[in-house]
């Protein structure tokens, strides 16, 4: 049977990995605009 716990952990890890640089880029972009 499929283990959803591992899938949830991988998805959350991927979200954190992708959202980290995205937030930094957005903050830098907004500061650069001002």
Swiss-Prot record:
It is found in: Plastid, Chloroplast thylakoid membrane. GO terms for biological process: photosynthesis. It is a single-pass membrane protein. Keywords: Chloroplast, Membrane, Photosynthesis, Photosystem II, Plastid, Thylakoid, Transmembrane, Transmembrane helix. GO terms for cellular component: chloroplast thylakoid membrane; photosystem II. PSII is composed of 1 copy each of membrane proteins PsbA, PsbB, PsbC, PsbD, PsbE, PsbF, PsbH, PsbI, PsbJ, PsbK, PsbL, PsbM, PsbT, PsbX, PsbY, PsbZ, Psb30/Ycf12, peripheral proteins of the oxygen-evolving complex and a large number of cofactors. It forms dimeric complexes. Belongs to the Psb30/Ycf12 family. This is Photosystem II reaction center protein Psb30. It comes from Emiliania huxleyi. The lineage of its organism: Eukaryota, Haptista, Haptophyta, Prymnesiophyceae, Isochrysidales.
């Amino acid at each position: 049977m499929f283990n959803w716990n591992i899938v949830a952990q991988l998805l959350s890890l991927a979200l954190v990995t992708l959202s980290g640089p995205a937030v930094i880029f957005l903050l830098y972009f907004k500061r650069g605009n001002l």
